Amino acid sequence: MQNNTFSRDDLSFEDGDVRNIHYGDVLIKYGTSVDIGNASIPCIKPDRNIEKFSSSSYLQNGDIVFADTAEDYAVGKATEIIGLSHHKVLSGLHTIPCRPHDTFAPMYLGYYFNSHHFRSQIFRMIQGIKVSSISKSEIVKTCILVPSYEDQTRIAAALHKIDSLIEREDATVLALQKTRRGLLQHLFI
């Protein structure tokens, strides 16, 4: 699979038909999976040339996008593509898009590639001092654990349930912090 080299300046939230998964978003914004139908993802500006990308370069559900560069050990963080229906999506600058040859349960690989078991393999392969990077040739040397499809489904469902609970609790904490700030501003006048 092929990624592109478009910078943030080549992207727009207002214009464009082809979405772009940027490495910075893989590192910071997206979790173990990114729901293309619901996530805010920038598009490649319409005046940029995307004709060189074949249909196999466009991401599909179940594809994995690794961030190949970071300023810390976040390098190699991965996100799994889910919720893709009619959108066209390319993997962007400093990413490594991967398409599994076998069928995996939805979200299993997103969780697995961010697990300690997998990331400990990646850490040994990282290159660089100030900016860390990993290459496709190193990623293909890693080993993955492949339980039965049913077990993959159970693992992904359990972890997703925990993630959903964490998101709800985070929203509650943010609301309480906002309320507290408001009270502190108005109570002691």
Residue map of PLM features:
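Low-complexity, Lys/Gly-biased intrinsically disordered segments
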Residues: M1-I36, T69
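Glutamine-centric residue-chemistry signal
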Residues: Q2, R119-Q121, Q127, V131, ...
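Short, solvent-exposed loop/turn positions at domain surfaces
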Residues: S7-R8, K52-F53, L84, G128, ...
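A short glycine-rich beta-alpha junction/loop motif
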Residues: R8, F13-D15, H87-T95, F104-M107, ...
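Short, charged, solvent-exposed linker or helix-capping segments at domain edges/interfaces
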Residues: T32-D35, L90, G110, F123-R124
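Amphipathic alpha-helical coiled-coil/heptad-repeat segments
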Residues: K141, L145-I189
